[in-house]
Every structure is written in structure tokens, then in C-alpha cells.
Amino acid sequence: MEITVDQMYNIENKGHDMGFLKKFMMENAGAAAVKRLVEKLGNVDSKNILIFVGMGNNGGDGLVMARHLAGYNAKVTVMLLGNPENIKTEESNWNWSILEKMPSVKLMTGGTTNFDFKPDVIVDGILGTGISGEIREPYASAINYINQTDCYKFAVDVPSGLDPQTGETANIFTKCDMTVTFHKMKQGIPKRKDLTGELFAEKIGIPPEAEEGIL
């Protein structure tokens, strides 16, 4: 079953109100994404994994992935496309603060548009379901960098620049090898398999009762 972005938003809010907090959803989303990635790649021990994160909850999922991948002994670099004080949500802030206590994960911040990495894998946690208007810097340069880099590319929830509701794209967008979205498939995502690559919808523990009156 495919659902709309608004339905997903309402299901998340209802689940949160039931006591299944959004930070639990974020934790389970990041963990499920890493499980899929590790299953695909096999051993990620010592692999250079670069995670681009935006300032919202899509970035927060990427922050959770960073912690889990460090547990697999990957060499993880997180590139936050902005300043930590501008992280938008409590859940993402909470996960950033954990990474700040983890020397095993390299943290980079700021609005740079000059990326000099040699990754084996890139995780796109830049933009999620809240896409609107033209994509600006530093996000645009990060997306360009992802597309120009020869490595395995993994999108969290949706490739950045793809509207998960309509399947339409912004002025710039990522092209990935695998996309893992959460709870249920959003209507627009499967329309662009050329951007998503392999596509999975993973359960993240939201109670089925959270769907009542919405689906």
C-alpha cells in the first residue's frame, strides 16, 4: 500500500502522541537503513563512508546511521551542511550530541561547497519529504558532488530533490543505487526508480493503531 506524505506525517504524530516518540522512530529508521546497507555490501569494516546530512529529520536519520556504522567498524565521516546550532529538530539535535562524544566518527560542519573526500559509500541524508522550491547552496553542491563521485550511493527515505508525493524533481537531485524509505511507501517514490535504485520500505515500529482514522 502506498500512502501520501501528509498521511505519513499524521501517522508519525499520532504514534508520537501514543508514546512511541519520534526519536524512537528516528532510531529505528537509521538502524533499518544500516541493516539494508550492510546486507547489500557485506562487510563494511574499514570502508570509508561519507554521510551528508541536512538540518532536518532526514539528516537525523543519517546521524543515527553514522553511529550504527561506527559499530560495524566503518570509517565514518559526517558532513553537516550547516551549523549544529541550526539543526531543526529535537531528535536530530539529540543524535548530533551523541556523535560529538564519539571520536570514532569524524564530524564536519558548515556551509562549505568544496568537498574533498574519497568515499567507498555515500549516504544521502540531505533532504527528505519537506522539499519545496529550488535547492540552494550548500545543498546543491553536495548533490552535485554525490552525482559526480564514483562510489555506492544510498538514499535515506528519498533521494534528495525527489518529491516523494508527486515523483517530480527539483532543479537538482541525487541519483542513488539504493533507497530505503520508512513505514510505508510514499506515492511518488516508485515513479523514479532511475533515481532510487533498489527500493525498500522498512517498518520502524510505529503501532498499527497510529494509522486508524488516517488510512
Swiss-Prot record:
Single annotated GO MF: nucleotide binding
Taxonomic superkingdom: Archaea
Keyword Isomerase: yes
Cofactor binding note of this UniProt entry: Binds 1 potassium ion per subunit.
EC number: 5.1.99.6
Binding site for (6S)-NADPHX: 57-61, 128-134, 139, 157
Key words, A-Z: Isomerase, Metal-binding, NAD, NADP, Nucleotide-binding, Potassium
InterPro entries: YjeF_N_dom (IPR004443), YjeF_N_dom_sf (IPR036652), YJEFN_prot_NAXE-like (IPR032976)
Catalytic reaction annotation: (6R)-NADHX = (6S)-NADHX; (6R)-NADPHX = (6S)-NADPHX
Uppermost EC category: isomerase
YjeF N-terminal domain span: 8-212
Binding site for K(+): 58, 124, 160
Requisite cofactors: K(+)
UniProt similarity note: Belongs to the NnrE/AIBP family.
Function, in words: Catalyzes the epimerization of the S- and R-forms of NAD(P)HX, a damaged form of NAD(P)H that is a result of enzymatic or heat-dependent hydration. This is a prerequisite for the S-specific NAD(P)H-hydrate dehydratase to allow the repair of both epimers of NAD(P)HX.
Name the record gives this protein: NAD(P)H-hydrate epimerase
UniProt gene name: nnrE
